[in-house]
Curated annotation (Swiss-Prot):
This is Protein P2-P3. Residues 550-561 have a biased composition (Basic residues). The record marks 221-222, 416-417 as: Cleavage. The keyword NAD does not apply.
Amino acid sequence: MALLGIKLMTLVFAAWLSCCHSSSALPSSGLSGPCLNHSCLLRNSLNGASQWGTILHSPAVGSNCPPCPMMSIMGCSPPKPLQSNSYGVLCSTIASKAKQDLKLCWKEVQTRSEMYSKRISAALIDSLHQAVGMLLMIIIWIWSSIFLVVYHVLAYMTTYHLSSAVCVGFLIFCTICAFRLISWICGDLLAFNVSGLTPIWVNFSESSCPAGLSLRRYKNEKTVEGYKPFIIPQKSPKKSVIELSFSNGSHLGYATCVRLWDGSICLMTAKHCLVKEALLKGRVAGHSLPVKNFDLFLTCDEIDFSLLRGPKQWEAYLGVKGADLITSNRIGRSPVTFYNLSKDGEWLANSAQITGRHGKLCSVLSNTSPGDSGTPYYSGKNVVGIHKGTSELENYNLMIPIPNIPGLTSPDFKFETTNVRGNLYNDEGFRLSVGEDDKAEHWTDRLMKSITFKTKRWADWAEEESESDDERGKVVPPAKPSNYGEGCPPEHNQYLSDVGDLLTKVIGPEQNEKCVDILMGIMGVDKNEVAPHKEEKAEKGKRSSGFGHGKNRKGTNHPMRRGYNFRNCKKGGGQDESESHREISGRDPGRESNDKSPQGEAEEFERYFSSFYSWKLHNSGEANSGFRPCGKIPKFYRPRKRRVSEWGQNLARKHSSLGEITQGFGWPEAGAEAELRSLRLQAQRWLERSKSSVIPSAIEREIVISRLVESYKICRSEAPLCSSGSDLSWKGFLEDFREAVSSLELDAGIGVPYIGYGYPTHRGWVENPRLLPVLSRLVYARLQRLATLSVDGKTPEELVRDGLVDPVRVFVKGEPHKQSKLDEGRYRLIMSVSLIDQLVARVLFQKQNKLELLLWRSIPSKPGFGLSTVEQVEEFIDHLARVVDVKSDDLLENWRELMVPTDCSGFDWSVSDWMLKDEMEVRNRLTINCNDLTRRLRNSWLYCLSNSDLALSDGSLLAQEVPGVQKSGSYNTSSTNSRIRVMAAYFAGASWAVAIGDDALESIDTTLAVYKSLGFKVEVSEDLEFCSHIFKTRSLAIPVNTSKMLYRLIYGYEPECGNLDVLRNYLCALASVLHELRHDQDLVQNLSKWLIPDGSQKIS
């Protein structure tokens, strides 16, 4: 063994030496000859001598090697003995042999592994087949067993207990019917747990009502994303808010001291704030009362409302007073205020906004924190509800409305309040306290009989310190206006050299006594009743003004006088085109007797306006691309091109630098010829782009729609009240209509065909107490047609004839145009919808659109933001930095690496029909209770908008042949365009985008080539441009249309003409332009010198 070990060590040592020498030993030693074989080599190597002269003897191997057979055949000389080879050669030969053996071994392992893998996979597949078959057999066995069991049970019951089983089933049926009958009869009464005979002590323990078993789907606090309130130090009205605390002094919530209409003072709070050992901390230091001293007077678990009666004079002890209430039937969408305590113990007033309904609660935009539960919301100095908490799914807080109990929480008579625009619960959706009016009286009688009042009746109540409390039930008549003349106010009769005094005296017509006219008109008070001595002058004014167009009559140009003329003018007469229209069209409904109902009068008006249309085709010569002539209406409008003011020309000659700034702009042509020319150019471009555009696949559209819904999810809003049920509701419509009218722009044009009645603006119908009910019936009738009539396949003229929509008036916008556009004749066209269609759109979409304006900070659409102040510019830059997830300084420095500012040329004309449909689908998915009626109304409205009749100024009607094209005068234009612009960015692959109209900022990963396939012409800005402003620094945004603004200012006004209205409008425009150019103080100073009229000029 020792000898064998020595040999092995020798071989290893020889192998190491072989690595140090060249590998040429094998051929030099003759081992590469044909006679070499491994057996001989091994024997020779073990018995021969090494090159060092060392001879190794092996007892196991013989020294004689038989002659090689190949030697005798080939005549080769016998090889040298292996002992003559070096150790390197021997080791190399052994290593070669080992390598070859290893390869053979690895090949064998691979072969066997593959064989075993196949066997294992085959076994697994076979086992899987057997398992599936066994599972199916088990399912079949269980299913058949169930049938067998049911069969045997039924057979057993039929054989032995048939009569008993029938009796049990009949009893169950009777029980269900009885329960439903009881719920139908007095289900509303079960909502309240009222006790007056026996005092109920407030005792809510954790053992009796553990928080873990609560089934409420609400959280108690939330900060609304995107809503930015104001917070100021202020005490609550009458110090009526009381802090609730635990027995150890830690904060719990809030309660409110309220005064009921029966004269009693009660404590109101959310029921979940009433916990064991809660304390009321008074406004007087050291004064507090335990809640257990109060009786639970009125409670409603459904809305978490509670009202408690306390010991005698408890409010005086705590240093608080009772606030008045506004109940659920008088709540509207309006700004409100709630109060809470700061960390330093100071009372703070927080702004909030009531936006709608959430079941039997109200949705409120407010930012609350833990511990704000129970705090009241105030409208003015009246409490409208209690803070409840928030929904887990929606982006708003919840307010508990105050139940309406006549004689207790609300009066028994009608009176005026400071409440707001429309009601939320003036329909059948909110019935907590009562179901019908007769039930209300019965329930109130029962409630009053069970209550023993320990405080003074209201008739004996007096609060000496309360100077804001009006006597309830006392109607204060409107004050009569003082006498005034027909002319302009005397303080408007002279120019002043100081701009500040000039703006103060000229701007501010609310200080004028003539505002009484408009206020009285809005309130519906007849001026002849309060100022009969003016009747003769009013009649004289009506005779000379016709339909309110008395432009040449002295005094009518004053803005306060125009409102009076429109409201009190005659419905007939006048020597203008409106008279001839009535002669052509027939009877004037304004001349009908006053005993007709508003609905009947509305039908007369519909026939009157329908008589304007002449649907016989008129040959207009050249065919218009995308539009075809389909009829005519009388020529109501006579637009004229604005002339360049002489005052502006004199300024440009006098100040050459001012002329250079305004160079390259001009006023566009006006009238039907200019409208038709521009319409052809725009339509031709639109059709060319639409041919090359490609509609994305249904899967791609669904992905983008889902992404948009996710991006706008915080703007989820409720459906209109009029369409909340299965049928159109008149009561709900009145509330929607009231809110829509309150937000109208009264000086906007009324549209076609209503201009034929003589009132050119919305004000003439809205402020007329006789026409406003007719207007509501006209809008409601159109909604009924949209809900019941099918619009599929109808042509634009058929839609108008069926009363589903009105023609869209087209006119050239009277703003400066670039000279290149003037030369081409490509003017900016405005497509203005009628007053009825405007109100229909507001009823259907106003909740969503207003919510988007309030929450612009958290959605991609930005129509709600402004750049008028430094603070607004900084806020937007900071907001944009948060969107990109960088710092504001890095954003302004490296914006080219982070975003792409883009603008779409001719965006309104590039909007396709499928884009409008997808945008409407997003709106529907963002509507909380969007039922079939709401979808049908909106889809029909969209079809009418996409297939419009265009009315030119000369009365020509052009029917739209290709659906699409956004109408610039529609109520949804700003909101819809912004969302479609974001939609296009998502199709282009942008990871984020913000947009306002056709302007957008999108992520750097967007693919601009996709826009061409969508039909858009996109231009990339070289600067950080958005909303017609270039952002230079965090606080500086420069407007890009400075030349256009100045051209409009100096060439669009004649401030030296002596007309007060012209002067007032010019000064307003001047102040606005100077404010926009505040970044260039040198230019502002020069403009102030050049553009302020001479102070010595008098008004003639």
